[in-house]
Amino acid sequence: MEIFITGLLLGASLLLSIGPQNVLVIKQGIKREGLIAVLLVCLISDVFLFIAGTLGVDLLSNAAPIVLDIMRWGGIAYLLWFAVMAAKDAMTNKVEAPQIIEETEPTVPDDTPLGGSAVATDTRNRVRVEVSVDKQRVWVKPMLMAIVLTWLNPNAYLDAFVFIGGVGAQYGDTGRWIFAAGAFAASLIWFPLVGFGAAALSRPLSSPKVWRWINVVVAVVMTALAIKLMLMG
């Protein structure tokens, strides 16, 4: 149980920093749009990354130690780029805050042709079908963005191999899997908490002023994480 708790705490410490995934989860929670798809991508990705990190850390560090350095510097570049984008958004006069998706009843024009009760009903049905199709597709873009921000983020591999795999390796063959399970438990708690919490607070969090400050915090945290990675070398 102690190993599990240690993994849980390490996983939580990695998640507490405002990273690209967290920002996306918050934004989609505020929009109430594609949140479940984003959460599933984040959680399923963590399963594969933690398994890869637990299995591959010894092989990678012994066979190709330079790969860890490449991932570290790639993570630094990625974090600095994300920090610059957040700072740019914070400094612009018009900050684009996520908008809440309101559900509205489709309307039919008043000039419906005579005898148009059936026509109006048919029109409403067609509009409802179109709205339903749009709602079905609305999760695709956030899901693809979650995949990109997870799997093209060098820092994700660094966390999986160096922190989850590297620290977990000291607990032996069985203990490292318990450690990884604890780290995943942190993800299982964190992502839904952040996403649904953002949805519950969507109205105050939709303010451009609030998002200007969020972008400032994101820029500072991303820069601090990049500096921390530099010092690890």
UniProtKB/Swiss-Prot annotation:
Classification of source organism: Bacteria, Bacillati, Actinomycetota, Actinomycetes, Mycobacteriales
Disulfides per UniProt: none
NCBIfam families: 2a75
Membrane topology: Multi-pass membrane protein
Recorded name of the encoding gene: lysE
Induction of expression: Positively regulated by LysG.
The protein's name: Lysine exporter LysE
Record note on disruption phenotype: Null mutant is unable to excrete L-lysine. Deletion of lysEG decreases the extracellular accumulation of L-lysine, L-arginine and L-citrulline.
Family (UniProt): Belongs to the LysE/ArgO transporter (TC 2.A.75) family.
Organism the protein comes from: Corynebacterium glutamicum (strain ATCC 13032 / DSM 20300 / JCM 1318 / BCRC 11384 / CCUG 27702 / LMG 3730 / NBRC 12168 / NCIMB 10025 / NRRL B-2784 / 534)
Stated regulation of activity: Transport process is modulated by three forces: the membrane potential, the chemical potential of lysine, and the proton gradient. Strongly inhibited by CCCP and valinomycin.
Gene Ontology molecular function, alphabetical: amino acid transmembrane transporter activity
